[in-house]
């Protein structure tokens, strides 16, 4: 009996010990689970492991042929899809140093239009091999040089005629006849016009970094310089006759000339800067400046003001050479305005569908 009681007591003791051990284990498990839960919650949601992307850059092989002889000049390999025609010209020059980038014109086919420098290879490529034809455009000059030469010449030429140097006019006749005030006013207006052109070329206009053939510079200078010589010769001639309606005609036309010059300047400044949205692709919209309100009526007000200036100068001086020059400039600017107007219609039809190109309600 004593042994049985002793064995029962030992079994009870073992059971109590096992229960206590189980409780401690459960408590530890609960603590571990609670700690693990906090750790998971603090770590946030599970995120999938980002897949490693391997960028594949497409390369093109460009074959360049001579547009005249149709013979292959070179092959440019490993040209990326983001490369432009300008980049291709640079690589072409490295491969063939005699082909200067400013003198090279690249075409997709012989006789086709020359590709602009900003065009990307991806936009013209039909396969991994691109065929281009190279043409030597001859001696090239920058557009800035063209504009500066065009406008500096008339400014200096007119001043030479205004000074009435003896090799142009008869010295005795020049000394005997006094100049009419409109002669001085015409010189002032003419100088203001071309000084504005020069300053805008240097500080306002965003002139293209491209080049143009030398013959275009010669043709432009011949046109502007030749007409300036003809105009200045008549206005500054000792036998020049003033306008028919006297000071009233001169004053009104001079005021209108200055207004058009100011309007032209403000329009050019506005066109050279993006609008308030910072987007160059938006159609120019008028602002608080009254000179910009012409945008309500026409899509190219800079040409409108330019023609207005020359019409005013024609009325003020009342000379045939100025009238002919104004007529030719009006025809040329109307063509430019219609071309730009068509571009605006394609891009911003909702903005300018009721506007004219250059002359309100007419053209």
From Swiss-Prot:
Give the membrane topology: Multi-pass membrane protein
Q: What protein is this chain from?
A: Trans-2,3-enoyl-CoA reductase-like
Group of enzyme by EC: oxidoreductase
Q: For this UniProt record, give its keywords in alphabetical order, as a comma-separated list.
A: Disease variant, Endoplasmic reticulum, Membrane, Oxidoreductase, Phosphoprotein, Transmembrane, Transmembrane helix
Q: Principal localization?
A: membrane
> Highest lineage ranks of the organism?
Eukaryota, Metazoa, Chordata, Craniata, Vertebrata
- Which family would the database say this protein is a member of? Belongs to the steroid 5-alpha reductase family.
Parts of the chain that traverse the membrane: 143-163, 217-237, 311-331
Species, as recorded: Homo sapiens
Q: In which tissues is it expressed?
A: Predominantly expressed in the heart and skeletal muscle.
* Phenotype when changing residue 196 to Q: In CPVT3; uncertain significance
EC number(s) recorded for this UniProt protein:
1.3.1.-
Q: Which GO terms describe its biological process?
A: very long-chain fatty acid biosynthetic process
**What are the GO MF terms of this UniProt record?**
oxidoreductase activity; oxidoreductase activity, acting on the CH-CH group of donors
Residues where Phosphoserine occurs? 37
Q: Cytoplasm: present as a keyword of the record?
A: no
Q: Where in the cell is it found?
A: Membrane; Endoplasmic reticulum
Q: Which disease is it linked to?
A: Ventricular tachycardia, catecholaminergic polymorphic, 3: An arrhythmogenic disorder characterized by stress-induced, bidirectional ventricular tachycardia that may degenerate into cardiac arrest and cause sudden death. Patients present with recurrent syncope, or sudden death after physical activity or emotional stress. CPVT3 is an autosomal recessive disorder with onset at early age and associated with sudden death in childhood. Patients manifest QT prolongation on adrenergic stimulation.
Instruction: Kindly list the GO CC terms recorded for this protein.
Output: endoplasmic reticulum; membrane
Question: Which InterPro entries does the entry mention?
Answer: 3-oxo-5_a-steroid_4-DH_C (IPR001104), SRD5A/TECR (IPR039357), TECR-like_N (IPR049127), TECRL_Ubl (IPR047822)
Query: Disulphide bridges in this chain?
Result: none
Q: Which domain of life is it from?
A: Eukaryota
The gene from which this protein is expressed is TECRL
């Amino acid at each position: 009996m004593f042994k049985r009681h002793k064995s029962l007591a030992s079994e009870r003791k073992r059971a109590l010990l096992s229960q206590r051990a189980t409780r401690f284990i459960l408590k530890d498990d609960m603590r571990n689970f609670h700690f693990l839960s906090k750790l998971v919650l603090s770590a946030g949601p599970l995120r999938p492991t980002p897949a490693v992307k391997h960028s594949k850059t497409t390369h093109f092989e460009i074959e360049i042929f001579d547009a005249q002889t149709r013979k292959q000049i070179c092959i440019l390999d490993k040209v990326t899809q983001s490369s432009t025609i300008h980049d291709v010209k640079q690589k072409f020059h490295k491969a063939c140093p005699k082909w200067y980038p400013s003198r090279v014109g690249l075409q997709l086919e012989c006789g086709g239009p020359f590709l602009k420098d900003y065009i990307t290879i991806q936009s013209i490529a039909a396969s991994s091999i691109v065929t281009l034809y190279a043409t030597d455009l001859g001696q090239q000059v920058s557009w800035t040089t063209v504009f500066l030469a065009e406008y500096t010449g008339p400014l200096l030429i007119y001043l030479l005629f205004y000074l009435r140097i003896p090799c142009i006019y008869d010295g005795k006749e020049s000394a005997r006849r006094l100049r009419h005030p409109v002669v001085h006013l015409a010189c002032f207006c003419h100088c203001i016009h071309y000084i504005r052109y020069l300053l805008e070329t240097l500080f306002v206009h965003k002139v293209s970094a491209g080049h143009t053939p030398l013959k275009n510079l010669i043709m432009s200078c011949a046109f502007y310089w030749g007409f300036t010589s003809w105009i200045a010769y008549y206005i500054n001639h000792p036998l020049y006759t003033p306008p028919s309606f006297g000071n009233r005609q001169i004053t009104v036309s001079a005021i209108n000339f200055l207004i058009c010059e100011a309007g032209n300047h403000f329009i050019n400044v506005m066109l050279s800067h993006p609008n308030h949205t910072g987007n160059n692709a938006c159609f120019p919209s008028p602002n608080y400046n009254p000179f910009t309100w012409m945008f309500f009526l026409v899509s190219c007000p800079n040409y409108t003001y330019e023609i207005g200036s020359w019409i005013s100068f024609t009325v003020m001086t009342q000379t045939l050479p100025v009238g002919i020059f104004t007529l030719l400039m009006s025809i040329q600017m109307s063509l430019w305005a219609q071309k730009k107007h068509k571009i605006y219609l394609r891009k911003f039809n909702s903005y300018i569908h009721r506007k004219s190109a250059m002359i309100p309600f007419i053209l």
